[in-house]
Amino acid sequence: MRKRHVCRLLACVLLVTALLGTAPAAASAAFADVPAGSWAEASINRCVQSGLFQGETATRFGMGRPMTRAAFTVVLCRFFGWELIKPEQPTYTDVRDPARWYYSAVETACAHGAITRQTENFRPNDPITREEMAVMLVRALGYTTLAGQAQELELPFADVTTNKGYIAMAYEMGIINGTSAATFSPERTATREQAAVMLMRLYDKVHCPAPKLVGIAAEQTGEWNGYDAVAVTGGRLSYAVNQALVTRPEQRREENLISSIHAGGAKALLQVSGNTTALKGKTSALASALDAAMKEGGYDGLYLSFDNLAENRAAALTALVKAVNELLPADKLLYVEVKAPAWNGGAGKAYAYGDLASAADCLVLQIEPYQLWDGKLMAAPMEPVEEVYYALSALNNSVPAEKLCLQLTTTASIWQGSKSSGSADAAELQALLEAEKVRTYYSERYQCAYVQQTGVNPVRVAWYLNEEAVRARVQLCGLFGVERICLGGRSAVSEAILAGITK
């Protein structure tokens, strides 16, 4: 009965898009109680045009009137495009009559996890509170588990004591605002126009265009249709004897890759890696060497990646990025790969994200992985979804979303027992999936796929991103306004990964 949240969002987009495209336009003048120019006028019009809302009468919307729990549940089912159900056995003691206009919506929302069975009563005629609305929206998006983890994070609202994770997520994703800088007013009832505004905010986020693709070109050749920018690997920055040096990829490989990238309509970036030692060099010399290497190779910009950046070198990296930005022509791009902020601190503490973003065109976020061994199964999800949420939330107020890019691991992580057996590209993973004595799974906890092969001892496990897992991460990016996804080498990018991004 319960559908996965990514399918819900797809249904939402298809339903609302169709409605918005075919419904006759309704002017706010149709409702005498909606003042022209009101802060909620546009959202009210869109909700009515799409069929999500109806006026209380032909001429009155019900501006300022509270939204009941039953009415909001009906609207929620319409928004997500859920197929209504009408079970013979009711879930709640106060929603027992199948003939009631909200009976099917309440049962459907319960089946999809938007509301729970924790109490016997649903209270359909009670005004919905701001807290209840936030909880229902976040649960409808499929983030119940994530909200449980998010309750550990700080909130600016002193008056929130329950459901902190749900309210934090709704607030951080820009679905619902506080009533002041320090208050959320969780018990305050929500009005019909407030519900309309929140739903249209959410609609705009889930209906955003597919993210732009950034690629990493490690192969000799490849097709790059549909990519926005592609980084050519092989560049290295070093500094010795008071001299900065940038080595470029082998010439024939470089020329072939740039040609194929341009043929696909993408920008070709020179990826230059380095370490903490390189950053000890003179900033102006390092920046000049990077600028010269980019121009000599005929690239459209630079993609900088520094390994194991020490916290005490953060200022040096920031200074270098600013110096490079000053040298680059206006039509050249500057991407910087960084470790993302992590729940436990980690390597992300070494970066001044706001300063880097002010000089670079894009920060490519690498999410730190983790492994959990329970004695039977190694859990090693790719780009753990709670870490993706934490990173985007942590950068929400310091880095513009349009300057962020989430990097996804395109290879599979192979484990035998508690020991790593390396990685597998798309072809190798497909061979494993087609092998004997294998079973595939999808972890709702990690929102990541894995396969177990039981014909070997110890059991072999491979964690990987399938279409559903990719959609879960792309969905989070969309909710935060992040417009780019970075993928690894073309040979490791499966059709399932591309489908999760583009469909």
Task: Put a short name on every predicted segment.
Residues 2, 19-41, 49, 54-103, ...:
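Feature responds to low-complexity, polar/acidic, surface-exposed segments characteristic
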Residues 11-21:
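Bacterial N-terminal signal peptides
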Residues 209-289:
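Glycan-recognition patch characteristic of GH18 chitinases/ENGases
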Residues 230, 304, 363, 406, ...:
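Conserved, mostly hydrophobic/aromatic
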Residues 239-252, 311-433:
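Substrate-binding surface in catalytic domains of secreted glycosidases
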Residues 287-316, 362-374, 486:
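Active-site groove signature of glycoside hydrolases
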Residues 403-473:
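Glycan-binding loop/region signatures in secreted carbohydrate-active enzymes
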Residues 453-503:
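Extracellular low-complexity, Gly/Ser/Thr-rich intrinsically disordered linkers
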